Design a protein with these regions (language model features):
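Phosphate/nucleotide-binding beta-alpha loop and adjacent structural elements of enzyme active sites
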Residues: 1-219
Length: 219
């Protein structure tokens, strides 16, 4: 089961394409990529994404399927792996609410993150080596990447530092069509993210397992 159920017509069409061998693959863990491409932007073949905590370039990737559709974007991760064949601009950096902060970062594959922000998987992550890194902000990354001010999809999965990352960019300047943000059922972080995004014009439209899904509030 995945995050977002398809309509009967969509499901039947997808099944037929799978039989014929022409169906796209969706490598994301819980269907974030399928939600974007089928539910949110089914007619968009040239969208733009921001993948923060991109990790493995293929396995579990929330944005590889988007690139295969023709999208472009930015991948941010201090230790990206298996990015051969990916087309996103890769920034090997750690992001927070402010630039220039020296932080301790645990390098655990898939669960690594800033030591002071780690939540649900903290004990597991702390078993991995730690290095010192200097933070940047998403605002700085977007500026250096010459990103468009409208970004179709934000994927944010950085093990407890999601709210700090959001605060590191101007959400009045950069607008998003859809967001999938990991919360890992951590409070008050989860509620703080929901409230912060609502203040900037977004509402939660779906939730599944460790992610909340957001879209602009309908006017």
């Amino acid at each position: 089961r995945e995050c977002c159920d398809l309509s009967m017509v969509q499901a039947a069409t997808l099944s037929a394409r799978q039989v014929l061998g022409s169906a796209p693959t969706y490598p994301s863990e819980i269907g974030q990529d399928k939600w974007v491409l089928i539910k949110m932007f089914p007619a968009v073949d040239d969208g733009f994404f921001l993948d923060v905590g991109s990790g493995h370039g293929t396995i579990g990737s929330n944005t590889k399927a988007l690139e295969e559709r023709g999208w472009s974007g930015i991948c941010v991760d201090p230790f990206p792996t298996y990015m051969d064949g990916r087309t996103c601009q890769v920034f090997k950096e750690v992001v927070s609410s402010a630039a220039g902060q020296v932080v301790k970062f645990h390098t655990h594959a898939g669960l690594g993150g800033i030591a002071d922000s780690l939540g649900k998987w903290k004990e597991e992550a702390q078993k991995s080596p730690a290095v010192e890194l200097t933070t940047t902000t998403l605002g700085d990354v977007l500026a250096r990447a010459n990103a468009p001010t409208f970004i179709h999809f934000l994927s944010l999965d950085i093990e407890g530092a999601e709210l700090d990352a959001l605060k590191g960019m101007d959400l009045n300047k950069y607008r998003f069509g859809a967001m999938a943000i990991e919360h890992n059922e951590e409070e008050p972080k989860r509620t703080d993210i929901i409230n912060y995004l609502r203040q900037h014009g977004y509402e939660r439209v779906h939730t599944y397992r460790q992610d909340d899904f957001f879209a602009p509030i309908a006017r």
